[in-house]
Amino acid sequence: MLQVLPADAAELVEQGGVIAYPTEAVYGLGCDPDNDEAINQLLQIKQRPWQKGLILVAGDYQQLLPYIDESQLNAQQLAFAQSKWPGPFTFIMPVKPGLSKLLSGAFDSIAVRVTAHAGVKALCAAIHKPIVSTSANLSGQEPALSPLAVKQQFEGIISGLVVGELGSQASPSTIIDARSGTVIREG
């Protein structure tokens, strides 16, 4: 399996590849959020139904603006989300009209996060946008916690593995509905 630095992984992503990369807690699988073919490939690899939707992880809040509909959130709701970022908080936000259903699934919202993980920030900076993020595992199995676990599940299936360390989070991010403030999953 090709092992690459974040800057080199950007080329794989821009070419429509699916990559694995370390995040705050587990390895993730990711691709270009503007490439439906790549998103379909990721969903097939993971054996995940498109209806569930996916998470976008960004290096900064500005990268999320083409994907979320801020007009459906009030100043308090936006300020609350931004007060938690960068960090291990994923917010469910209204989706911008016209966004691919492969990202939002069967919902009128999308899960988004601004990462504090240096490697993911570097990757997002290199591709100039957020990256699709879902845990590196087949649907229903435990997420990969090491490069070896990624290789065992995805050798010959994904385009590359980003070299780096997992962050210090013991569990995946907390998920909060930005409109209601309801915690959907404790991290």
UniProtKB/Swiss-Prot annotation:
It catalyses: L-threonine + hydrogencarbonate + ATP = L-threonylcarbamoyladenylate + diphosphate + H2O. Keywords: ATP-binding, Cytoplasm, Nucleotide-binding, Nucleotidyltransferase, Transferase, tRNA processing. One of its GO terms (biological process) is regulation of translational fidelity. It is found in: Cytoplasm. HAMAP family: TsaC. One of its GO terms (molecular function) is ATP binding. Belongs to the SUA5 family. TsaC subfamily. NCBIfam families: L-threonylcarbamoyladenylate synthase. This is Threonylcarbamoyl-AMP synthase. It is an enzyme of class 2 (transferase). Its main location: cytoplasm. Required for the formation of a threonylcarbamoyl group on adenosine at position 37 (t(6)A37) in tRNAs that read codons beginning with adenine. Catalyzes the conversion of L-threonine, HCO(3)(-)/CO(2) and ATP to give threonylcarbamoyl-AMP (TC-AMP) as the acyladenylate intermediate, with the release of diphosphate. It holds the Pfam family Sua5_yciO_yrdC. Residues 3-187 form the YrdC-like domain.
